[in-house]
Curated annotation (Swiss-Prot):
UniProt cross-link Beta-methyllanthionine (Thr-Cys), position: 48-54, 60-63
Function: Lanthionine-containing peptide that does probably not show antibacterial activity, since its analog [+2]Flvbeta.h does not show antibacterial activity against M.luteus. Also does not show antibiotic activity when tested with [Del2]Flvalpha.a, an analog of Flvalpha.a, which is encoded by the same operon than Flvbeta.h. The bactericidal activity of lantibiotics is based on depolarization of energized bacterial cytoplasmic membranes, initiated by the formation of aqueous transmembrane pores.
Originating organism: Ruminococcus flavefaciens
Protein name listed in UniProt: Lantipeptide Flvbeta.h
Keywords: Secreted, Thioether bond
Keyword Secreted: yes
Length: 65
């Protein structure tokens, strides 16, 4: 979660936590990316992320909007 702390200026960190917790992907999931959306007074913020379990730190996949 610390990785996404810079978004706190746009979305409260606890709301980002809630979005991740409601979109947990298991290690055997076939879902590649999760799209997270939050409505703020300034507009809708959309994040597309990949959640991977990387025991060897070999994750190279990146998601795109």
């Amino acid at each position: 979660m610390e990785r996404y702390g810079h978004l706190a200026g746009v979305i409260p960190v606890d709301e980002i936590d809630d979005m991740f917790e409601s979109n947990v992907i298991g290690g055997t999931s076939s879902i590649d990316c999760v799209r997270l959306a939050s409505n703020t007074p300034e507009g809708t913020v959309n994040l597309t992320v990949r959640i991977e379990f990387c025991p060897s730190a070999a994750c190279t996949y990146s998601c795109r909007l």
